[in-house]
Structures are given as C-alpha cells and as structure tokens.
C-alpha cells in the first residue's frame, strides 16, 4: 500500500511540474511588458517550461522597448522572424538577459532555448544595466552566471559593443547553425565572449566580417572551455595596435578551444594569431 501511495505521489509531483507549461503566441509587433500579446508581456507572464512562438502574420519584425529578462526556463521560436531593439546599433539596451550576472548562492539555473530568428542588437557602449557595472557586456544577449543558452538557427546582426556585441556568456552556451555577421566591439570579442568557467559548444556556426579593436575579431575566450565543430570564420578583423587573434583569441589560465573541421579565411590582425 505504501508503495502504491508513493507512486501516486510521484506521479502527481511530476504532473504538477509540467501542468502549467503552455504553448503561447506573440501576436503584436511592438509594445512593452504591460501590453498583452507583445513579446515582453508573454515572456513575463509565461509559466516556466512554456514554448513561445512569434505569430505576426506577414509582418517581419518584433520590436522591444527594453531588455527582456529571462527568469524561468523557456523556449522561444521566432518562426523565421526578426527580434530587434527600437534602433538597431543605437538603442542602449540588450534584447535578452538570461538569469543574473550576480545571482544569490544556490540560485535556480535558468535556461533559454532560442531558435529560428534574427537578432538586431543595440549599442552596448552606452548600455544601462542596474544589476551589474559591466554594462558594456553584450549589446544583444547576456547569459548570466545562473543562465544557460541553447541557440539554433539564429542570425546576429548590426550590434556594437565593448565586449561581444552578439553574446556575452557568463553561463554555458550551446549554439548550432548560428550566424554572427557585421558585429563590432572595442574590447575583447567582436561577436562572442565566453567568460571564466563557461563551456561553449558551437556546431555549424559562421562568423563573418566581425571587427574588434583589441583582441578576437570574432570570438574571445577567457578562462573558458570551447568546442568549435564545422564552423566558418571569414573576414574577421582586429584593427587596434598590438592586438591579437583575428578570428579567435584565448586569454587567462584554463582557456581552451578544440577546433574540428573548421574553415578560416581572410581573417586579419595587427600582431599575433591571424586565425
């Protein structure tokens, strides 16, 4: 009898953990967190575990007025549409912040799966972030220390920043078939930066015509573990004096990059490590 009660209790627990997850639609192309049907509203009100889809008909772009904080496990499917700040390359806020840069001890791990969309980010050099003084970290997506990002079929364009105009990863990231093009930075990592202790996995990704004035025209890896498989690096550039790593730059103890079947063409730097 006790075993039967235990099984029933377990079943109820499992059911309760997923019962409120939903499939939700974004139906409006602009608006803030207080307006039903917008992306900020749907994310803020979605139960954990929900799948959110952009459903905007023939319209091509969803514009957000401020950074969307991801504080629960979610999947967002862009359905081939674009998610943009109000003024790409100009607006001083990110698109997504996943978890927190300084979470409390024992904070819950927050996971975002993001797929099938183009992301137009802003100008991170003027970005305001009240949670961390590292405001210049990423003009498009910041993955906090208790955050993880799984990205599939994403395109990152237009953004500029200090560190990593596309993604600043302080938590683990896994990207498949993603494209970073035309992004620019003034510190390390024109498109992407993986921070200390992070594991980054990149499969079939393309880094094209990204620039930086310090180190890592496309990617900077700082004390992180990284795996690049079937990726393409082309036309990435470091322009500053005494700068290194036209495509990938490794810094700090423990930084590593395993590179398998990747292609490097026409990347350049002013000092060491063209590729």
Listing of model-derived features with the role each one plays in the protein:
Residues 27, 32, 161, 259, ...:
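Conserved beta-strand/short-helix segments
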Residues 65, 89-104, 126-143, 160-168, ...:
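Extracellular beta-strand/beta-solenoid scaffold signature
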Residues 53, 69, 75-77, 84, ...:
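Extracellular beta-strand solenoid repeats
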Residues 1-23:
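Sec-dependent, cleavable N-terminal signal peptides
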Residues 20-145:
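N-terminal, post-signal-peptide segments of secreted/periplasmic proteins
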Residues 79-82, 108-121, 148-160, 172-184, ...:
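Right-handed parallel beta-helix
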């Amino acid at each position: 009898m006790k075993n039967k009660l235990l099984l029933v209790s377990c079943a109820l627990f499992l059911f309760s953990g997923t019962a409120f997850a939903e499939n939700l639609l974004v139906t409006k192309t602009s608006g803030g967190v207080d307006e039903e049907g917008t992306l900020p509203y749907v994310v803020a009100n979605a139960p954990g575990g929900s799948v959110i889809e952009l459903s905007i008909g023939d319209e091509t772009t969803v514009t957000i007025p401020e950074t969307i904080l991801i504080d629960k496990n979610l999947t967002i499917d862009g359905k081939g549409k674009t998610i943009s700040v109000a003024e790409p390359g100009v607006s001083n806020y990110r698109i997504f912040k996943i978890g927190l840069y300084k979470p409390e001890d024992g904070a819950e791990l927050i996971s975002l799966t993001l797929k099938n969309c183009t992301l137009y980010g802003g100008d991170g050099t003027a970005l305001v972030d009240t949670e961390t003084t590292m405001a210049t970290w990423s003009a498009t997506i910041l993955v906090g220390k208790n955050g993880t990002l799984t990205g599939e079929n994403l395109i990152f364009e237009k953004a500029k920043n200090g560190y990593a105009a596309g993604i600043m990863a302080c938590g683990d990231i896994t990207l498949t078939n993603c494209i970073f093009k035309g992004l620019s930075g003034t510190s390390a990592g024109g498109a992407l930066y993986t921070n200390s202790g992070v594991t980054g996995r990149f499969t079939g990704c393309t880094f094209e015509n990204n620039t930086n004035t310090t180190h890592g025209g496309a990617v900077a890896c700082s004390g992180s573990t990284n795996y690049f498989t079937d990726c393409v690096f082309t036309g990435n550039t470091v322009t500053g004096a005494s700068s290194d790593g036209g495509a990938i730059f490794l810094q700090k103890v423990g930084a590593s990059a395993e590179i398998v079947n990747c292609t490097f063409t026409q990347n350049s730097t002013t000092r060491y490590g063209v590729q």
